[in-house]
Amino acid sequence: GIPCGESCVYIPCITTAIGCSCKNKVCYRN
């Protein structure tokens, strides 16, 4: 549920490397 400061509208989340995932076009972690 914590925003990772990255969007995933056009490209996947790079922050998946630290546990973030794409939700509602924004990358979140927990």
Curated annotation (Swiss-Prot):
Post-translational modification: This is a cyclic peptide.
Disulfide bonds: 4-20, 8-22, 13-27
Cyclopeptide (Gly-Asn) cross-link, renumbered residues: 1-30
Keyword match Glycoprotein: no
Organism field: Melicytus dentatus (Tree violet)
Keyword field: Disulfide bond, Plant defense
InterPro entries, alphabetized: Cyclotide, Cyclotide_bracelet_CS, Cyclotide_sf
Function: Probably participates in a plant defense mechanism.
Name of the protein described by the UniProt record: Cyclotide mden-I
Description of its domains: The presence of a 'disulfide through disulfide knot' structurally defines this protein as a knottin.
Family assignment from sequence similarity: Belongs to the cyclotide family. Bracelet subfamily.
UniProt KW Disulfide bond keyword: yes
Domain of life: Eukaryota
GO biological process: defense response
A Pfam family reported for this protein in Swiss-Prot or TrEMBL: Cyclotide
